Structures are given as C-alpha cells and as structure tokens.
C-alpha cells in the first residue's frame, strides 16, 4: 500500500518464508483494513494473531505458551501490551540488525488491565474463524479473557526514538482515508514533528526500566542484572 518504512524489504530479508500480500485498500482506512484482515483470517486454521509492524509477541517458551492456550478455557485471549518508550538519559544507540530489537530496548510502560473496565489495549490471539474485531483490533465483539501469564506484546511506540522512527510516524497521516478522518479513526496519525517531540517528552516522564519487573525477568532473564 505504498509504505515507505521498508517493512516489505525487511520481511523479505529476515522472514523470507512469509507470504506478503498487497492491501486491497489504497488508503489507510482502519475499518476496511480490519475487514480485509478478517477475510485473510478465514483462510487459516488454528491460533491467529494480527500485529502491526512495530509489535512483537514475546514469551519465555513458545511451546509452553501455545500449550497453555490449548488448556485454558476460551477461544480468544488478550495479550497485554508494553508501550516501548526510550528513556532519554539512558544513552541508547541506533539499533543493530545483528540482534533482536526487543533485546536492545528495555524501557516502557506495562499497560495493566483495570478490573472494572474492558481491556482494549492488548492484541488478541484466537482460534475462531475470524476475530470479529472492534475497529483497531484491540478488542472484539466476541468474549475474550486477559492472558495473565508472562507474555506481552512489545509495541515500539516512541522507541527507538531516532530519525527513522520519526519519519515512519509522519508517513502514516497523509495516507488516511477521508472516511477515517471524518470518523476520527487514526486521527492521532495526523501530526507534525513538533507534536511528536512534545508527546515523546511527556511519555518519557512515564517510562520505566522493565528489567525491574518480575514478569519481564522471566521472559528476558539474560537482560536483567
């Protein structure tokens, strides 16, 4: 769909066995993209999860993770999200392709569920024919439970905070469909570099060292002091 963040090139290089499909939608329309995603899900059996380019599912043991899904009651689970945000005084350097990005950054905010509210911050994994998603795919019209074992979606939100990430955030807004703009879907993508820097400074005051959290230590024991 005309992406300029090299995501297709990156997939071909690091995941050559992946199937790459061109989107049917020439513009970025959250509703239409979700419908297209669900059409593709109908072609697949077993556990399914839809992630954006900047999102990574991390757990300590993949086999144990899927075994737990099969033994738990339910067909759909929300995996909690960690918003990755660089701590400005930590001295992070630009990422290296020789090491997984999730092992090069360890500051962020764990979005924990509120028992009195529907959790609409994670990503859903399910074995239904499709996800029946709410717009944006953080929630579903199907019932789902929150997966509370040590597994997270690492969303690189304001991390790595370098020129490449800033350009990626700025490229999305101009591709929004008028339908999305009118409905306020994805309006946060319509921004400027000044607004991005202001938001980063705010989120940087909230970011924490994830290595201090027991659940993170289980997933990445080699990164923890």
Q: Which role fits each region the language model picked out?
A:
Residues 1-10, 24-26:
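A conserved acidic beta->alpha catalytic loop
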Residues 34-48:
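Active-site nucleotide-sugar/metal-binding loop of Leloir-type enzymes
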Residues 18, 47-49, 74-76:
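Short, Asp-centered acidic motifs that coordinate Mg2+ and/or phosphate
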Residues 12-31:
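Conserved donor nucleotide-binding strand/loop of the catalytic core
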Residues 13-15, 43, 71-72, 148:
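Short, well-ordered coil/turn elements that cap or connect secondary structure elements
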Residues 30-35, 59-225:
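Catalytic-site signature of metal-activated, phosphate-bearing donor transferases
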Residues 45-59:
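Short beta-strand-to-loop acidic/aromatic patch adjacent to the donor-nucleotide binding site
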